[in-house]
Amino acid sequence: MTDQGVAKEQYITVGSLKEIADPVKKFLRKGNRKGRNQKELKFRAKVVNQQLADETGSINFTTEGVAVNNNQTYEFTGSLKVVDYKLNLAVTSATPAKDQIANLGSEQLSKADIDQHSGKHIVLIKDLINLRIGQSFFARPKDIVHNNEQRRMTATLADNTAAIQAEISVNKKSITQEVLESLNSDKVYLFSDVVLNFNESNKLVARFNYRSNIVEANDRQIQQLSNNNLSAKEYSDETEKKALTDVLQIHEKKERVHKQQNKNKNPRNAHKNHNRQRPNLQETEPVKISGLQQWNNNQTVIGKIVSLRTEDKSLPAKQDGTSTTMVYLKGTIGDETGVIDFDMAEKRDCPRFKENDVVKFTSVMNKGRQSAEGKVGGHYIEVKKFGQYIILSDHNINNVNLNNNLSNLELTARPKNPNPRFIKGEFVGVKEEEKDGNIQYTYTVRSKEGEEQSITIRNKITTLKVGEIHKIDRERKRSSSRPNHQGGQRGNRSHSQNNRNQRNRDKHHNSQNNQPNKYKNTSVQNNNNNKNQQRSQSQNQRPPRNYDNRQGGENRNNRQRNENNRNNFNGNGHRVNNQNNQRNRNSSYPRNNNYDHHHNQQTDISGLEPGKRGQNVTGQVIEVSEFSKQINDKTLHFVKGRIADENANIRFDIKKPQNLEIKVGEVYNFKDVNNKVDDNGYHYIDLNRFGRVFPSHKKFQSINDKRNCDADRSSIEYVKKTVPN
């Protein structure tokens, strides 16, 4: 080009290749498939000692029939590759540049080893991080033990820094039985995509999954193997093991919860789970035993287990004859103020406590037992469905007041709701009365304990029988009828009523008395009676599936005809689809709307969960900078910096918003962010596809702008916080 300034803008620097490392890793992992080839990069660099260098850094390169001279500057085109475990530029063309590059940068991009299989850096065994997924390292196997029946083997992988026990199984891709049998203790191998996890002996071992790979490294030598076995430590402390396991399971666990929450938020599933959603009960402050409130189902108490016994109870048998046995924990818990009995079902996700343990109960309800006369007896507590019991190993209660036993005191009757939504029990009778010119009915039922409950509604229910068990709901017109799924609750006419009106109208307009068509008749006469008959048939029964491919076209025609005939007429003569459109018109989502993250929850910076999408966070910008990237011949602008609130601060790296300038000292709301972890194990947030940034009116009295010695890292340290040394 003639304009030198324009020509320079088309080329990227060598140092900026580090910025596009992640796309290169993804490319290497997926392989050089059709349609996934990298586009060629354009850059200016100087040939210096078998490397290409400019003002930002240097990188190794290879040429394919391209001749270059040392200490000369060229305009190159090429792509990134991995050659001999080093990041390399494959040059396809070189044109001498008009001006030379004088000052060269010191950063070397080809210094670290890169695994071509996973696209990640190769580390030493001593630098392996506990429970991190997808790590690669060079090692020599020793103490190899094969198990041909289970198609797996165990070995100790070692280099000159450390060793670790490994459990290798055959996968469907790269690790075959022949590969396992060919492993030799005298050779060095590259083990790719390895995860550290616990074995049956509570020790950390290296495990291989379906992505893992084992390749012989002929150009690598490990002379002396280290005896520092990382698997020698046994994690006997359940608390320490659980803290490590949470790091590995947090992504898939949060993903399951996130999918279930999105399923519950879908209006189409509202009738399935409107009674199954977990209540948003926040843990309350612990209270003393003597301060337990009666009939309050959201209390927290801490006490010492005085006595404990278990009791098995079989649930009613199912239709297939199987029955489930529940384990109930019963005993006494106390503190300095008194003691009280407890009676609750054992929870599978909570470890069982024993006598003299200090335990915290959450979502506790102070209840009372029913006597034979129907009166409420003494106190006892129960952990509700969504509560937990947690063993507090660092808490101690020395003196327990055994003289004040709350279970011996009489508990007042549970307060009744003066206006319940529904009542259930043995029907006693109904009373009719007039109020404000309207007739209303008061229905009375008797519970199993002999208590009578009443409910007053305006609807008269004629299906109730004295002495039978009924549930009377205020919101339903009938007590024991199923919902009308054909539009009755929405005020629409049912299909049978529509069909009856259509038949009467068709008889009036057409005097011909044709025989009704058979089901799936391909010849349909052009008259209203036949159309109406086929409408009725298609609505009341569905055509059976036909798996004969030779008649697929005919069956498709019949199904399409039945779909078209489901369009009924309303009272005004207009054609509408009562079966789908009217019922779901206001309950479906737009096609391009990301309804997975409609209900994002606001959280503090310290409460951001790693790997979880759809989080909202508000913070004050304490530093900001802009930079540009050349991606696919396009220049994209990005903004990175750091935001902080009262508790913590974190880095952000996002695409520059349109019509918004992010300034230091201003407060912004980051909506729908993803808390990611970089290769060094530290947090940063970026925006998801539908995320955005906008100013916030929130004010902070003080912010936490403290950071580590390395200002490039966030204050939330993923590795140091979750994994002990």
UniProtKB/Swiss-Prot annotation:
GO terms for molecular function: DNA binding. Residues 252-284, 468-614 are annotated as: Disordered. The N-terminus is blocked. GO terms for cellular component: nucleus. Residues 468-478, 545-564 have a biased composition (Basic and acidic residues). The keyword Transmembrane helix does not apply. The keyword DNA-binding applies. It comes from the Eukaryota. Keywords: DNA-binding, Nucleus. Residues 517-544, 565-593 have a biased composition (Low complexity). Its main location: nucleus. It is found in: Nucleus. A motif (Nuclear localization signal) lies at residues 241-258. Residues 256-277 have a biased composition (Basic residues). Binds specifically to parallel G4-DNA, a four-stranded structure stabilized by tetrads of hydrogen-bonded guanines. This is G-quartet DNA-binding protein TGP1. The gene is TGP1.
